[in-house]
């Protein structure tokens, strides 16, 4: 007899896991504590809400996260399928209308006949086949139970979200539409800065007031989502190699490359909202308004959402998990999402996809499977379970996680294409073996 699967958390990983389990013909109880209990970062009651950027990053197969998306599409991913449905222009990236995206996923999950939604907080680890996908903002009571079960200290870092601006308040005479190196459609509004403007902006940023952290929390930032003010403090030129990099963004009015450029990315389908790319911040709201209005074109900008910052927790997965996302201590317990140390929206959903496939197999009396390292799904699972536990940090999908190709290819683009083609070929064999 097929057993049911209990999934805790309906974020990106939990939603994907529920979809995979139910589509394998296994009943699911999906627990989500919102709206009964809220988190500091979520704004809505929808599943798979995006709390940071609205971009799911690169879509090309010369980009590891692009390969990961394609692998997920081929496994009927609800997250990538819904992202494709609700995409907004973003050059070579896959960005979405954040509200439509989470609404689409919520509707699909709620209408699935094998998924039962339960809006309540879980404070202990249940019996039976369970996937815990409660994310970086796991409630205190469940966090404590997970730590007690795992017998090891959790880690944490801070994740910060960028401000969102009303497009109608941007001075369009001072900005220009362009994607870096003219890749894809011209999808970004670019705010050029002279050296003098940049220096004044940097000075204001490093001296702006931030929201103080609670005394018992130690600052620990993941490099991929570092607050802009922390980046600015690392040196006057640091931002010029990060979110303010001018390379490939020549100003069409002058034909020259500005000293610095700040990019604004479309945040909704109506193109009425734009976020400041890479400007995650923990500045006080009044300071955000003052400092970010120094950006050319944003002198009178209205902020529909200020940048916010919240704590993210993740486990010491190399010590605790198998590459199937099963607990080493209990075979019928799976973990998925950012709490496992995968970093990024797509990676979180991907871990939920694998945990879901394997939980469904277990429910049907079949053996869970490890995806080969030649696939992006497999390379991520391998990394988080084989890295050195002592120095374990969250990781994005990247080509450095894959095994080397049998032949050496000097050209980087050709090498990445070869890795991508191998990944999809190997995945096709895995899918065939699952049927």
From Swiss-Prot:
Please tell me where this protein is predominantly located.
cytoplasm
Gene3D superfamilies hit by this protein = FAD/NAD(P)-binding domain (3.50.50.60)
- Top-level enzyme category: transferase
UniProt-listed InterPro entries: FAD/NAD-bd_sf, MnmG-rel, MnmG-rel_CS, MnmG_N, TrmFO
Name the EC number(s): 2.1.1.74
Q: Please list the cofactors this protein needs.
A: FAD
Positions with a binding annotation for FAD = 9-14
* SUPFAM superfamilies (alphabetical): FAD/NAD(P)-binding domain
Catalysed transformations (reactions): uridine(54) in tRNA + (6R)-5,10-methylene-5,6,7,8-tetrahydrofolate + NADH + H(+) = 5-methyluridine(54) in tRNA + (6S)-5,6,7,8-tetrahydrofolate + NAD(+); uridine(54) in tRNA + (6R)-5,10-methylene-5,6,7,8-tetrahydrofolate + NADPH + H(+) = 5-methyluridine(54) in tRNA + (6S)-5,6,7,8-tetrahydrofolate + NADP(+)
Keywords in alphabetical order, please: Cytoplasm, FAD, Flavoprotein, Methyltransferase, NAD, NADP, Transferase, tRNA processing
- Show the GO cellular component annotation of the record: cytosol
Subcellular localization(s) per the UniProt record = Cytoplasm
Q: Name one GO molecular function term.
A: flavin adenine dinucleotide binding
Pfam families, per the entry: GIDA (PF01134)
Q: What biological processes does GO assign it?
A: tRNA methylation; tRNA wobble uridine modification
Extract the PROSITE patterns matched here: GIDA_2
Briefly, what is this protein's role? Catalyzes the folate-dependent formation of 5-methyl-uridine at position 54 (M-5-U54) in all tRNAs.
Its family? Belongs to the MnmG family. TrmFO subfamily.
Quote the NCBIfam families the UniProt record gives: gid_trmFO, PRK05335.1
Its protein name is: Methylenetetrahydrofolate--tRNA-(uracil-5-)-methyltransferase TrmFO
Protein encoded by which gene: trmFO
């Amino acid at each position: 007899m097929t057993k049911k699967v209990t999934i805790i958390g309906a974020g990106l990983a939990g939603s994907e896991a529920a979809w995979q389990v139910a589509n394998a013909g296994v009943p699911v109880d999906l627990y989500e504590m919102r709206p009964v209990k809220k988190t500091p970062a979520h704004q809505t009651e929808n599943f798979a809400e995006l709390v940071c950027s609205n971009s799911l990053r690169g879509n090309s197969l010369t980009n590891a996260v692009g390969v990961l998306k394609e692998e997920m599409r081929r496994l009927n991913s609800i997250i990538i399928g819904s992202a494709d449905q609700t995409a907004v222009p973003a050059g070579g990236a896959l960005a979405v209308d954040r509200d439509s995206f989470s609404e689409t996923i919520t509707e699909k999950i709620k209408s699935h006949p094998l998924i039962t939604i339960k809006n309540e907080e879980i404070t202990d680890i249940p019996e039976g086949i369970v996937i815990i996908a409660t994310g970086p903002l796991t409630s205190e009571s469940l966090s404590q139970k997970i730590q007690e079960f795992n017998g090891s200290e959790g880690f944490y870092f801070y994740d910060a979200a960028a401000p969102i601006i009303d497009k109608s308040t941007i001075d369009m005479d001072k900005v220009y539409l362009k994607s870096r190196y003219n890749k894809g459609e011209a999808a970004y509004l670019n705010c050029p800065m002279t050296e003098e403007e940049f220096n004044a902006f940097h000075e204001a940023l490093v001296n702006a007031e931030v929201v103080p952290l609670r005394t018992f929390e130690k600052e620990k930032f993941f490099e991929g989502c570092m607050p802009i003010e922390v980046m600015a403090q690392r040196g006057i030129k640091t931002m010029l190699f990060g979110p303010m990099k001018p390379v490939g963004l020549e100003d069409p009015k002058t034909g020259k490359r500005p000293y610095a450029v700040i990019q604004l990315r479309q945040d909704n389908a109506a193109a009425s909202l734009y976020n400041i790319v890479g400007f995650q911040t923990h500045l006080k709201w009044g300071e955000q308004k003052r400092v970010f209005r120094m950006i050319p074109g944003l002198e009178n900008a209205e902020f529909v959402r200020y940048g916010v910052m919240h704590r993210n927790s993740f486990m010491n997965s190399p010590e605790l998990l198998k590459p199937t996302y099963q607990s080493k201590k209990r075979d019928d317990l799976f973990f998925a999402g950012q709490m496992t140390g995968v970093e990024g929206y797509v990676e979180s959903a991907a871990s939920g996809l694998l945990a879901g496939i394997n939980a469904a197999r277990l429910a049907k009396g079949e053996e869970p499977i490890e995806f080969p390292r030649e696939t992006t799904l497999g390379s991520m699972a391998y990394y988080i379970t084989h890295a050195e536990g002592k120095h374990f940090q969250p990781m994005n999908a990247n080509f450095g996680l894959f095994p080397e190709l049998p032949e050496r290819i000097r050209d980087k683009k050709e090498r990445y294409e070869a890795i991508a083609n191998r990944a999809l070929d190997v995945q096709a064999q895995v899918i065939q073996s699952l049927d």
